[in-house]
């Protein structure tokens, strides 16, 4: 009951319904993470309490951003163990989710999670964001692109903004010190057709975690040359 109450309280804070079905799905997901983490490197966070707070509640906090609540489709880029895409799907069943990751072992794990939790309207893609963002079925097709991946904001923006339709949003889940990244990325975001609309500070109760949600609105279509070829983006971020 302790974990149920913690998760329910976090959902209440962002006006999300929470029930036994969602709780059981999250606990099953936690158990699968712990089981599979013995075989492949999914996360350094493995204790029950830490998974609940540092992964699940961190993902719940993204619903503080109103675009998530209104979205019909979302792509999670560099999803890793499925964060934040899987928790978003569990908590908002009507959204269509695409999970993108470059490592096949993680995709195999995510497909197991999807099957075990009986999640619908969710797919996994194995490959590079740079490649999929040039494909017609994915380019500028999503209401929301989100990423919790570890990369600077200029790099993440070039990976993610091309997936977002005009009028949609890219939401970057960043750490506590984001000011320098924002300053360095502002021009690249503009080049890609976006503009920073909001920066939301996130505190995770009973932990030392402090995060920021950087909310970027897509104002114009992204030029055809972006994203650039694999390898170039990290070596030469847009300025």
From Swiss-Prot:
The answer, when asked if Oxidoreductase is one of the entry's keywords, is no
One GO MF term on file is: rRNA (guanine-N7-)-methyltransferase activity
Tell me the InterPro entries matching this sequence: rRNA_ssu_MeTfrase_G, SAM-dependent_MTases_sf
> Single GO cellular component annotation?
cytosol
Entry keywords, A to Z: Cytoplasm, Methyltransferase, rRNA processing, S-adenosyl-L-methionine, Transferase
Q: What is its EC number?
A: 2.1.1.-
Q: Which Gene3D superfamilies match?
A: Vaccinia Virus protein VP39
Tell me the compartments it is located in: Cytoplasm
Enzyme class, first EC level, given as a word:
transferase
Which residues hold S-adenosyl-L-methionine? 78, 83, 129-130, 148
Protein family: Belongs to the methyltransferase superfamily. RNA methyltransferase RsmG family.
**Alphabetical list of NCBIfam families matching this protein:** rsmG_gidB
HAMAP family the UniProt entry points to: 16SrRNA_methyltr_G
Outline what the protein does: Specifically methylates the N7 position of a guanine in 16S rRNA.
Q: What is this protein called?
A: Ribosomal RNA small subunit methyltransferase G
Tell me the organism.
Answer: Clostridium botulinum (strain Kyoto / Type A2)
The upper taxonomy is:
Bacteria, Bacillati, Bacillota, Clostridia, Eubacteriales
Gene from which this protein is expressed = rsmG
């Amino acid at each position: 009951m302790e974990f149920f109450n913690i998760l329910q309280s976090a959902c209440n804070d962002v006006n999300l319904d929470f029930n036994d079905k969602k709780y059981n799905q999250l606990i099953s997901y936690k158990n699968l993470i712990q089981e599979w983490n013995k075989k492949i490197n999914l996360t350094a966070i493995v204790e029950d309490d830490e998974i609940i707070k540092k992964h699940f509640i961190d993902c719940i906090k993204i619903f503080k951003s109103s675009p998530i609540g209104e979205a019909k489709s979302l792509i999670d880029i560099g999803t890793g163990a499925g964060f934040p895409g899987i928790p978003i799907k569990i908590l908002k069943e009507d959204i269509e989710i695409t999970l993108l990751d470059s490592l096949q072992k993680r995709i195999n794990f995510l497909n197991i999670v999807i099957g075990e939790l009986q999640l619908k309207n969710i797919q996994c893609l194995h490959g590079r964001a740079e490649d999929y963002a040039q494909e017609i079925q994915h380019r500028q097709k999503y209401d929301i692109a989100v990423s919790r991946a570890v990369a600077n904001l200029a790099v993440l923006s070039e990976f993610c903004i091309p997936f977002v339709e005009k009028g949609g949003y890219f939401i970057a889940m960043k750490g506590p010190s984001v000011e320098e990244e924002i300053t360095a990325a502002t021009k690249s975001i503009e080049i890609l057709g976006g503009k920073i609309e909001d920066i939301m500070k996130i505190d995770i109760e009973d932990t030392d975690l402090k995060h920021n949600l950087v909310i970027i609105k897509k104002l114009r279509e992204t030029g055809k040359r972006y994203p650039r070829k694999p390898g170039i983006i990290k070596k030469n971020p847009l300025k």
